Amino acid sequence: MKLVTRMWSILIVFFLAVLQPAQAEVRIVIDEGVDSARPIAVVPFKWNGPGSAPADIADIIAADLRHSGKFNPIPVNRMPQHPTSVSEVNPEAWAALGIDAVVVGHVTPANGSFNIAYQLVDTIGATGTAGTVLTQNQYTVTAKWLRYGAHTVSDEVFEKLTGIRGAFRTRIAYIVQKHGGSQPYEVRVSDYDGFNQFVVNRSAQPLMSPAWSHDGKKLAYVSFENKKSQLVVQDLGSGARKVVASFNGHNGAPAFSPDGSRLAFASSKDGVLNIYVMNLGSGQISQLTSGTGNNTEPSWSPDGQTIVFTSDRSGSPQVYQMSASGGGASLVSTGGRSYSGQMTADGSAIIMISRDNIVKKDLASGSTEVLSSTFLDENPSISPNGIMIIYSSTQGLGKVLQLVSADGRFKARLPGNDGQVKFPAWSPYLTK
């Protein structure tokens, strides 16, 4: 089938838009947690064309599964055989290595495009018979969509083996503060793994806090380009920008509602920093918080009914939650400095910063778990399937992006090499 027919227009405009490519990309560097993950084999895909293959599809798939923290693809040199279809798979040879699933496939040139075909094979008979195909598919893509095609395979394999939707076709937005230059501040977007990076906006003045719209077509962020803080919403397809909030005082921390109709943000327009919600259709604004304390960093629950936010009303920053329509707030965090709260996709937990590390609080039991061990962690953002958390931390004299799994076992870095990288925001799903 044609993979392009399954893409939303947002994915096409990422490449067609008049946005500027970035010179240096971030890449995932794994620190710990893979060795204890589930072993799997992704056999090199057979290339059915002349010369060398235009991309190593199997390597991309293996990297995706490894980055999830749930799988540990074995090295090619440890593979007992190199099958390219289910008929060539020897289940016993793989089962002897503790491998219960094998991905095989091939890539074939097709009239200027490329056909990617794969099969996921059960090697231990978990579904009844060893050697059974668990799932299979094929896609025809152009050269620039080869990585996307590989990510599609990864998503399908991941979901089949875990029951959780894959998030390898998502993107991240972040801020880079470059070393020198007349416009050192940049809003950038890349694939979740750092590839295909481009610049959304450059500025001589600070840029902060990018946030995705529900459909992935727009970014909201804070800009100081007019010598004051203002909230900007930018269309990623056309590049068109609109200032939606430029009140006196500070305007910051934008967050789109799950349905995209509202934008929560913080503003000190009346002297104290409070949470407001803007109806993006009418422009009408309602104030959610009040009192003498500062309230900021709003984020939405998955159902759009609750706002999680940070407030110093008790004397130190703590995480609270309240109804998105207003009313009283309840304390989520306890003890120490806590901020940057965000609810997980299933609504069962809140991820936040507590004592400068990433912490997960289970809302049912009240138990907390420290997930990170890095230094001065900030701005956590959760993948749409809830498996991974991206955040920024201090490394040396600068800021870098970090990844940690929601169970705290897998850890990785996305170091930048042309400036400080901060304020990461994980996109929603970009496919149907």
Swiss-Prot record:
InterPro entries: 6-blade_b-propeller_TolB-like (IPR011042), PD40 (IPR011659), Tol-Pal_TolB (IPR014167), TolB_N (IPR007195). It holds the Pfam family TolB_N. It is found in: Periplasm. One of its GO terms (cellular component) is periplasmic space. Residues 1-24 form the signal peptide. SUPFAM superfamilies: TolB, N-terminal domain, Tricorn protease N-terminal domain. NCBIfam families: propeller_TolB (TIGR02800). Part of the Tol-Pal system, which plays a role in outer membrane invagination during cell division and is important for maintaining outer membrane integrity. Belongs to the TolB family. This is Tol-Pal system protein TolB.
